[in-house]
Amino acid sequence: MQRRLTLICVLCVLFVPLAGYSAAAQPRPAGLPFQVYLPIVRGPPAPPNPFGFDLRTHINNAVIGYVTGANPKWTRAGDVLWSDIEPVRGGGYRWEVLAQVEANVRRLRSAGVEPTLVVQRSPAWAQRTPGRLCSPPKPEYVGDFVKFMAALAARYSSGDAAVHYWEIWNEPDFSPAEAPDVGGYGCWADSSLPYHGGAYYGEVLKRIYPAIKAADPNAVVLGGALYYFWPDDSVSRSFLDGILSTGAGNAMDALSFHAYGAWGASDLLVNKTLRLRAILNSRGLTNKPLFATEIAATCGFTAPCPPNFHQTQANYAARIYAEAAALGLQGAFWFTLAINDPGFQSSQLIDDDAGKLTPRPSYYAFLNSALLLQGTRYVGPPMKVLAADQLNQVQVLTFHKDRSSFPALNGAPVTLYVLWVPQIDFPQLYNLQVPPGAQAVCADELNLNPHDPDPLQQPHFYMCSDTNNDGMIPRAVNGLPKYVEVIQ
């Protein structure tokens, strides 16, 4: 009982609302109490926020409360299927097929989230690979695709359903033999073509890019959308080299790619980002922004998932956006926010059971970590692929934050540390080096619901200052990341 009372008192100190500051009312999940929750950010504009997710049209509006709760910047809001909109060449555009996508864009925009759309699937009359929706258009029909993209960008250049971010195809580095149409993959890869078809993709990109920009000067074109195979990236690398060999690096505003799960001691997001950056650097495109438009922890195609999968997924969710920020990604989208199980390899953060939405621990890990990371700038050493011997060692990411998330630290500038161990059976003791006597707040159990009526079932936030002035804050670190804010 004494521990329970102590924790409640600490929580009251840490989360007392700041008087005089209010926010516009936003939809929220039914049954959640109305309260001002961390972080409370004021002052200069926050640094770029890479956090986002995929949210499709069929999920009911109750999901919007979960969207606004995490304060994301981005969402992948659906697909534009050229094959459905122009089934007959020259027969006009059937924009009505986008009604549900438009409705999704509107509700996301009203929630303050920037939508992106994926353009894919060639009509039967335009397919380079006959009978395959994933096919690129034939050379003689690229002009039709250019006209379509110009009309599309113009249609959605303004209004309450405005879309400015366009991703061109989805995973085109798959070949037709590898990509069933029902999977939503592209299939531009062709070993008989230069650079496995990447040069052709680049030439198409060079033609549609100016048309999109002319139709909407605010448009942002995401090129690539690469699956980027790993560890054997020979085809994907050739495909990307082909894109860049045509000069199409200047016909996209950002390069997008997908990265799921871990590889060795590192997350594949780190491996792939560093590999892609090296390739871009070799082409003089050092500052080309990167978007990871699909990330997640999945349990693969085998069912059922392992018994501990939800905890493993939560561990990943609590660190992956810190890694995305440390990597300098423009965007990182979890695929997907909500769907019926198993969805895509059980990757979702929220289970949708006939309209009943049940957040997983990974959703709360996403929410709590994203809020703690709001307004941060990475100040640690450059990210690198971890060696195998780091698998059971504590990893630390360091961020600067102009204002603490916690009223207990009086909104002072802080250094935020994110600590975890990639794989470990027992917690690893780690002494975090801080200035002697530094004030600090520790955040643990980020996979818990911050709105749970029982404070013991909420994330744990408590003072963990260096009270003995030895310049160390001891932490027992395991797979679920711990966050520590230290006054500078």
For every predicted segment, state its role:
Residues 454-488:
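C-terminal beta-strand-rich structural cap/linker in extracellular carbohydrate-active enzymes
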Residues 8-19:
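Bacterial N-terminal signal peptides
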